[in-house]
Regions:
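Glycine-rich phosphate/pyrophosphate-binding beta-alpha loops
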Residues: 242-250, 337-341, 353-364, 417-425, ...
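Extended C-terminal subregions enriched in glycine
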Residues: 346, 394, 428-429, 437-497
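Internal maturation/activation junctions in enzymes
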Residues: 264-356, 369, 376, 495
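Short, small/polar residue-rich loop motifs at catalytic or cofactor-binding pockets
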Residues: 228, 334-337, 398-400
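Active-site rim segments in enzyme catalytic domains, especially the processed small/beta chain
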Residues: 51-68, 72-76, 216-217, 348-414, ...
């Protein structure tokens, strides 16, 4: 595997931020330099991303976070996903759930997550933390090429410009033009001053209920909460891998790793290693199809799934000479998302992913607030046999997942993630193997050629299982691609950096030094203090 890089790793001792947008990185660093904690800086980064990357995440979206408290060697999973409105049920839809409009949304969970993080880590006031986001919304920021491309790309698929008018955007925006969002600034100021209640009990909640014709109720907003739980944790080599519990598909990442642990990946030829990992992915995705849903509504036996006997049985299905094109024997689309990480001078760190699901989510803005809603309700199934069947108050299965890695002594070793719908767990699988087995540094890892196995070329679905196309960046040697084809994979070449991920990665040395890497496939970077 080539280890040449476009960028150098970033080394720091007193704090680090890595994100997909430079202004968000600057906001996080600003909060750290003012004495804020990793949690404070993460909230600031999150809020700025909602302002400057609204197509990927917003106050009307969701968040999942894995945190590490260095002093207590404590890891937590924050599940900031929203529930279906109590008016939402399968009989409200014919053949599919609406993709746009308020009926495509779940209760937003991001703002609630901010305040749970602040409870756990907060040192500065929310006025101080949200000040950078309020400034960019009130006084404007210069549109970069990614911002302009995201708007034009959305308009090519959906010519209706109403969502952009509601956000206050000029659809003829050019790179360098100033983007001002006065209504969003007002909403952020209300949240900074009045706290969580401003969103879930106050004027914002009332405006959502009124504009949605009662689809959402005040009860839906008032009853929402971010769940704070122990993460799922499994041993891989000499490390503990921490992932998101259901309804996140973080369990699939852990299953992939457990299957792969039975093989010496470091000594494998690259074609064999890719083949093995793709086959492990197929098995794990088949399990997801049968098991993944909201654990508050269905039973999910993860102890059984992760048991050594279950993993051994799944591992035995892998033929190292031939791709499995049939359904694995298991027990009974592109997405718009943003990932970032933050660590502080005390060794505390957060791995954070937030999203409105598809590009610009529901394409519907709560009137008078500047807040864009998610379209995460489309993550449900209308099949009554599915564990992910839609129901009032239920959370849909989520592609969103964040992860961290600790050593046997409990200290943080790695943290990372990426957006990308079903690509997420596949990319994260590769990142962890590259770090632990292949010993790549974070920047080498972020830039390394990647693959993705999808149910169809360019496609992504929560029903995805085992069939599909293996897409590989064309920096991989031709002999490797040919070997994969000979094993039976349907291989398609992506451009050199054409994989749909935007990775941010952190390594923490035993002496506490931070090393961060940022993906050249996106416009962000890493910065330290």
């Amino acid at each position: 595997m080539s280890q040449s890089t476009h960028r150098s790793p970033v080394y720091a001792r007193n704090g680090i931020v890595a994100a997909s947008q430079p202004l968000a990185v600057s906001a996080g660093i600003e909060i750290l330099t003012k004495g804020g904690s990793a949690g404070d800086a993460a909230i600031a980064t999150s809020a700025v991303l909602a302002v400057v990357e609204p197509g990927a995440s917003h106050l009307g979206g969701d968040a999942f976070v894995i945190s590490h408290n260095a002093a207590r060697k404590k890891n937590l999973a924050f599940n900031g996903s929203g529930e279906a409105a109590h008016s939402a049920s399968a009989d409200q839809f014919k053949n599919e759930i609406d993709h746009h409009g308020y009926k495509s949304a779940t209760v937003p969970g991001l703002v609630s997550t901010w305040f749970e993080i602040h409870k756990e880590f907060g040192l500065l006031s929310m006025d101080q933390i949200l000040a950078p986001a309020i400034d960019y919304a009130r006084n404007g920021f210069a549109a970069n090429s990614g911002f302009v491309k995201r708007i034009s790309g959305h308009l090519k698929m959906f010519p209706d410009t109403q969502v952009f008018k509601s956000l206050g955007f000029d659809t003829n925006l050019k790179v360098g033009d100033l983007v001002v969002q006065s209504e969003l600034a007002d909403s952020l100021e209300a949240i900074a001053q009045d706290g969580r209640d401003a969103f879930y009990l106050g004027e914002i909640a009332r405006k959502l209920v009124e504009a949605s014709d009662g689809w959402f109720s005040l009860r839906d907003l008032a009853e929402h909460r971010t769940r704070v739980l122990p993460p799922l944790s499994v041993k891989y080599r000499d490390y503990l891998i921490h992932g998101q519990p259901p309804p996140s598909q973080g369990m699939i990442l852990l299953e992939e790793l457990l299957i792969a642990e039975g093989f010496d990946l470091a000594k494998m030829q690259e074609a064999d290693r890719i083949h093995l990992m793709v086959e492990a992915k197929k098995i794990a995705f088949a399990d997801r199809y049968l098991l993944l849903g909201d654990p508050e509504h269905i039973d999910i036996n993860l102890e059984e799934l992760f048991a050594s006997s279950s993993i051994t049985a799944r591992r035995s299905q892998i033929n190292m000479d031939r791709a499995n094109l049939k359904e694995p024997s298991v027990s009974s689309e592109g997405s718009d998302t943003t990932y970032f990480l933050v660590a502080d001078r005390d060794g505390n760190a957060l791995s954070w992913i937030q999203s409105v699901f598809h590009g610009f989510g529901a394409s519907w803005v709560i009137p008078g607030t500047g807040i864009l809603l998610n379209n995460r309700l489309t993550g449900f199934s209308l099949d009554p046999k599915s564990p992910n069947f839609i129901a009032p108050g239920k959370r849909p299965a989520h592609t969103l997942n964040a992860w961290s890695v600790t050593r046997e002594d409990g200290s943080l070793a790695y943290m990372g993630g990426t957006p990308g719908a079903n690509i997420q767990v596949q990319s994260n699988f590769q990142l962890i193997v590259n770090a632990i087995d292949l010993k790549l540094n974070p920047q080498e890892n972020a830039e390394a050629p990647r693959w993705q196995h999808l149910n169809k070329a360019g496609g992504s679905s929560l029903d995805e299982k085992y069939e599909g196309v293996l897409q590989v960046e064309n920096r991989v040697e031709k002999e490797i691609l040919q070997s994969l084809k000979e094993k039976g994979h349907s291989v398609e070449e992506l451009s050199a950096y054409g994989h749909g991920s935007a990775v941010q990665l952190l390594e923490v040395l035993p002496n506490g030094t931070y090393i961060a890497g940022s993906d050249p496939r996106c416009e962000g970077h890493a910065a330290g203090i």
